[in-house]
């Protein structure tokens, strides 16, 4: 594939985006990494030849920067999303209006293919603002770019993930493991599989205009995931169920903490199963074999084991370069 073909990845320096950038560069695309902080995206440049991976300042909330990012692009991928609002209205600004803006300007620029990363549970009528605005974003995407491919992953895991790393760190410090909505079901999907699904969606004619739900090979209850984290980190901790009333009080307090580790909106999401809808197209329909949690997660949770502080974290650069080969995954 000629390197003159251009792909734009909004949020390309993020957890999922970096894996997509790597694959596009490997396929020979000139990759525009459209991000708010170009300095934070410089680590991606070695994924391609000189000048092939180009960090570009853009915000999905800004018309001019989105226009510049999609102009002349053959393919566009939107991975932008947030888990918590810093200001009221951020979910709608980013998930709904931002997604619609990307689709509208991509269509106007003559972009051939557009892939949008949404989330399982996206529904304009959802109680959670996160899920509702994700649903609104999907609707705006389809209205502006009818051939958009929408991918809805469940909980995404990988070396840079939020959930497994966060709770492993908590287990290292806390004598108990708090469990909120422990019976809620998740179908964790590997970040590399999500990126492979994006690449398949960009190249398959039958993916245009379709929606896929992405989940791994096993459905886990939330308490099972937490117990698995304790097992893989070698930590013996009491698992303590937290009543919803107390959880709401904790969330109200944590919303005022920098980084907002828990919000009331996240509690709403935790009360709904996050699994692939039966008979919905998924990874296998895109030719991707789902990767089990057990094949990848132990590799990057080793550092949380007793005495594991001396072990290096798997490289945040998904090119696979790391000083400790025992931590390499198939990516």
Regions found by a protein language model. Name each.
Residues 2-30:
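N-terminal Rossmann NAD(P)H-binding glycine-rich loop of SDR-like oxidoreductase domains
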């Amino acid at each position: 594939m000629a390197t003159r073909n251009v792909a734009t990845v909004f949020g390309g320096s993020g957890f999922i985006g970096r894996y997509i950038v790597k694959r596009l560069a490997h396929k020979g695309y000139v990759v525009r990494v459209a991000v708010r902080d170009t300095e934070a995206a410089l680590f991606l440049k070695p994924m391609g030849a000189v000048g092939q991976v180009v960090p570009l300042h853009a915000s999905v909330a800004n018309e001019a920067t989105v226009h510049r990012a999609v102009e002349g692009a053959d393919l566009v991928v939107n991975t932008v999303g947030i888990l918590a609002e810093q200001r009221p209205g951020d979910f709608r600004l980013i998930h709904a209006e931002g997604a619609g803006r990307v689709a509208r300007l991509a269509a106007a620029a003559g972009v051939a293919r557009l892939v949008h990363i949404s989330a399982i549970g996206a529904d304009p009528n959802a109680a959670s603002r996160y899920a509702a605005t994700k649903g609104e974003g999907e609707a705006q995407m389809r209205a502006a770019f009818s051939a958009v491919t929408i991918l809805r992953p469940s909980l995404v895991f990988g070396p840079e993930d939020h959930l497994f790393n966060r709770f492993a760190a908590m287990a290292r410090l806390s004598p108990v493991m708090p469990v909120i909505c422990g019976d809620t079901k998740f179908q964790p999907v590997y970040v590399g599989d999500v990126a492979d699904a994006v690449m398949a969606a960009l190249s398959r004619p039958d993916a245009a205009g379709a929606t896929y739900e992405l989940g791994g090979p096993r459905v886990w209850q939330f308490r099972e995931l937490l117990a698995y984290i304790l097992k893989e980190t070698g930590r013996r901790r009491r698992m303590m169920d937290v009543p919803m009333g107390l959880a709401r009080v904790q969330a109200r307090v944590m919303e005022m903490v920098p980084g907002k580790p828990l919000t009331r909106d996240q509690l709403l999401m935790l009360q709904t199963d996050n699994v692939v809808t039966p008979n919905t197209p998924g990874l296998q329909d895109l030719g991707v074999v789902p990767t089990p949690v057990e094949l990848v997660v132990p590799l990057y949770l080793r550092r949380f084991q007793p005495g594991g502080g001396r072990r290096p974290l798997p490289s945040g650069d998904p090119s696979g370069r790391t000083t400790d080969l025992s931590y390499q995954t198939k990516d």
